[in-house]
Every structure is written in C-alpha cells, then in structure tokens.
Design a protein with these regions (language model features):
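Alpha-helical adaptor scaffolds
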Residues: 107-153
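N-terminal alpha-helical interaction modules that lie
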Residues: 1-78, 82-92, 99, 103-113, ...
Length: 171
C-alpha cells in the first residue's frame, strides 16, 4: 500500500505541474510556460534550465541520486518537465532546443524505468514511446541506444500474457 501511495503522490505532483504548463501553452504564453518550467527546475534540483542543459547527463543523474539511489520522484518530474520544455520549443519552431530537451528527457525516463519497474503503472513507457517518435528523425547517441537496449533486455512476457518488466543489474 505504501508503494501505491508513493506512486500516486508522484503522479499528483507531476499532474499539477503539467496542468499549469499546459494552461500557459494553450494561451500561447510560451515564455510564461518556460519561466514556470525553469522555476520548477530550481525548486526540484536547485538549478535552472540553462544549468541543466549545460551539464552532462551523468552530472544530472548524480544531482538526482542520494547514497547511490536515484530519487525517482525528482527524476520523473525533471523528465516530464524536459519533455514539456521540448514541446514548447517545438511549438516555437526551435527544433535544436526541442531535440536537446527531448533527448535528456528520454534518457531520464529510461533510467527511471531501469531503476523501478513499479513506475510502469504511471505510463512512463508511453512517454518513452512518444519521445522516440519525436526523435525518430535523428540518430540517437550511443548512450541512449545502450539504455534502450537494456530496457528491451528487461522486457518479457508474463505468464498471464501481459507485458512486464524486470530490472537487471547495469553494473
């Protein structure tokens, strides 16, 4: 029951943030949406969008990790915000910025899925599929392909015929 409460809390946090961003997008207040995303980045990890895009993904993961454990709540929020940021850049006709946001978001979602198979309940897998669609015109970097391969290795068909995942050691 505690795990379900945790997952619901994550979903509520992400949902609230997205609702505000979607509102700004609908009224075409793109700068307002980007400012909100930047503020949420600062609240979550103590750094704004510019800093998050300037650091390596390894550094970002280190910022979201405590004692070797990825903070899934923060990682999920950051990944979702990066995807929303990419959508805004795409709406503004800035494909280079959209690509960077989408790619970092995709890699974070993949890391999340590889860390905790319980988060499939939040439809994180559909986020990955959506991002892969947005990035299909690009050749994915080797690290992203490695993460995808690891995820595909973890996928299996359960005895009841449903699709499931299991986590394998990545070290």
């Amino acid at each position: 029951m505690t795990q379900k409460d945790y997952i619901l809390r994550i979903a509520e946090d992400v949902g609230r943030a997205l609702a505000q961003i979607i509102y700004h997008k609908e009224i075409q207040d793109y700068q307002g949406a980007l400012s909100l995303i930047d503020e949420l980045f600062k609240q979550t990890v103590g750094a704004g969008s510019g800093f998050l895009h300037a650091i390596s993904e390894e550094t970002l993961l280190a910022m979201l990790t405590l004692l070797g454990v990825l903070n899934l709540e923060k990682a999920l929020l950051i990944a979702t915000l990066l995807k929303a940021e990419g959508d805004i850049y795409e709406d503004q006709g800035n494909p280079e910025a959209a690509y960077e946001s989408y790619l970092t978001s995709l890699n974070l979602f993949l890391e999340i899925l590889l860390c905790d198979d319980n988060l499939h309940d939040l439809r994180v897998s559909s986020e990955v599929e959506d991002l892969l669609g947005k990035l299909e015109a690009y050749e994915l970097p080797q690290n992203t392909r490695r993460l995808l391969f690891q995820l595909y290795l973890c996928a299996f068909v359960r005895e009841d015929g449903g699709k499931g995942y299991y986590v394998v050691s990545r070290r």
